Amino acid sequence: MAERTLVTSALPYANGPLHIGHAVEYVQTDIYVRFLRSCGRDVVYFCADDTHGTPIELNAAKQGLKPEEFIARFHEEHQRDFHDLDVRFDYFHSTNSPENRQYAELIYGRLKEKGDIERRNIEQTYCENDRRFLPDRFIKGTCPNCKASDQYGDACEKCGKAYDPTDLIDARCALCGTPPVRKHSEHLFFKLSRHEDFLQDVLRKPGFIHPGLATQLQGFFEKGLSDWDISRDGPYFGFAIPGETDKYFYVWLDAPIGYIATTEKWAKETGKAKSALDYWSADADTRIIHFIGKDIVYFHALFWPAVLNVAGFHIPSEIKVHGHLMLNGEKMSKTRGTMVPVRDYLDQLDPSYLRYFYAANLGPGVEDLDLNLKDFRQRVNGELVNNVGNLANRALSLLAGPLEKRLAPGRAEGPGRELVEAALARVPEVRDAFDKLEYRSAIRVITEIASAANGFLQTAAPWAQVKKDAEVARADLSDAADVAYLLGALLAPVTPRLSEKLFAQLGAEPLTFQALEGAKYPLLDRSRPIGTPEPLLPRLEEERVNAIIKLPEGAAAPQAAEARPAKGAKTEKKPAEAPAATQAAAPSAGAAESPGEIEYDDFAKVVLKAGKVLAAEKVQKADKLLKLTVDVGEGSPRTIVSGIAEAFAPEALTGRNVVVVANLKPRKLKGIESRGMLLTAGPGGKELSLLDPGDVAPGSEVK
């Protein structure tokens, strides 16, 4: 039997809405699963709400709800958000389910049979008023490290230090405010320390986890692995431990078992497997891949494999770990209004924008990802809207108009055929990049393919050719449509709804990576008419992007990261502030001297034209310069050297609409003749915006 792949994302906690930081992981995983399916692989994708534990019990009580009612509300909300974000699980379940209880009890029983469960007396905080032990979140007090007040019993939200509930200063019960007492209780521990050799072998397996994380995990072995407390005293929202009185499984025992329970539920409902054991038995021919954030590596790489191994289950084959999401270079924060719920994003913007931006910045490492809102807008507009979208719109609009939606047969030779064949030759690069989670590399190749096709159209100029020889124009546009079809297939894992629109406009069946194996020119069935073209995605406007952040009253709007001086650059000391009256009268320090008024005739000499950037590259030995190839409607594009390299990556400019000073005398910069200038606005350096004339034809005069 061929190997099957089972993929999971970490379980979202049913204690609140999903935010765009959570979305990084689910989008990353969904892209991978869609890619595997496109390649014809046998893959299933599971997730569930993590529903047990103290925070849920506490917050449900605050809202006057039973925990079951509380988690049901967020379960429905999470499912809706995932669907609208285009994340498609084979099954999304809950850890508060009969299947999860079944497997939690089964696994616990096997751990107990193997002698891996030990009873120990531990000291805990206890509220005599409420007659209950107080887990971390049921106790508050002063942080023993930074002395911040009103902190929970597990970690300080101000300094970030972790501690035991018994370490809190002036501790009190979070429910009633009564100072707790200390009391002994018998708890159950999983003997993780017995499995160090096994876990060392697991960490040494190639591909199991990122090498840097494997090295980091060695620190736990140097200190000696600690046995794991898997029980909590009642009352507690979770599963009662069989054979025990008033003891419950700690959430970190039953939460990962939710992966197995979800497989079981899916098997029951679909009949596609006899049970979860078809995938999870120790001898199953299954590749199990967990996608997680870097904050839960310990549980998934050490505790979880040890538990599975003792219980006779299949251990994870690979653990894919990602970093956290930053917003404009800073940690997201509720108090600053930057902890953006997924729903707030979806109320404003298409999910394709966010999925594309995440993919364009994700690799297989664990570095944090920065959602800089300015960069987000520029990259999406430059690469997705103006490059990929523009190619499809240019080709299909002409085909649908004067050429009556009919494609030309494939050509025996010529630049159009060479364009398509060159694009097909790059498919293995994209496939390999997706397979290795090098999404940003895949996106780079995809945008290069689109740029080449736009350049081909610019040279062929079918909008002019159609008046001279309609069949030549039809052939050129059909070859460009072939590339658009290919781009739809390559982008389908990332932006599925955009690809669906593109396939429909082409009048073609969805194209997959599997179908591309051995594919030859022409890709499209040239005997079929195309559909009705329309813009695939509107441009991202600054107002809509900023609207995803709902600021608390009195909070300042978050800004993109300030430009910093280059390393070794000199900076002037800020002069002492002058009296207010003097400041008002004098020009700002460093301001350019005004040239004064000019005559209209002087201004009329300047010719401003709309242009479109076809290609962009860095100028060697010039950190601030970019060499741009710009179409200004003259038959052949111009080369313009522009000092905007600090503000824009070359790949973010391809496809951008720009305003060009078209009648400047050519001049050489770094040995390159520059024939024009782009209009920008801003203080300079990294803080520049390109003036955009809108969706007008290259060469249109700007008045």
From Swiss-Prot:
Its cofactor is Zn(2+). A motif ('HIGH' region) lies at residues 12-22. It is found in: Cytoplasm. Its EC number is 6.1.1.10. ATP binds at residue 334. It catalyses: tRNA(Met) + L-methionine + ATP = L-methionyl-tRNA(Met) + AMP + diphosphate. CDD domains: Anticodon_Ia_Met (cd07957), MetRS_core (cd00814), tRNA_bind_EcMetRS_like (cd02800). One of its GO terms (biological process) is methionyl-tRNA aminoacylation. The keyword Isomerase does not apply. Binds 1 zinc ion per subunit. GO terms for molecular function: ATP binding; metal ion binding; methionine-tRNA ligase activity; tRNA binding. PROSITE patterns: AA_TRNA_LIGASE_I, TRBD. Keywords: Aminoacyl-tRNA synthetase, ATP-binding, Cytoplasm, Ligase, Metal-binding, Nucleotide-binding, Protein biosynthesis, RNA-binding, tRNA-binding, Zinc. Residues 602-703 form the tRNA-binding domain. A motif ('KMSKS' region) lies at residues 331-335. Zn(2+) binds at residues 143, 146, 156, 159. Belongs to the class-I aminoacyl-tRNA synthetase family. MetG type 1 subfamily. Homodimer. This is Methionine--tRNA ligase. It comes from Myxococcus xanthus (strain DK1622).
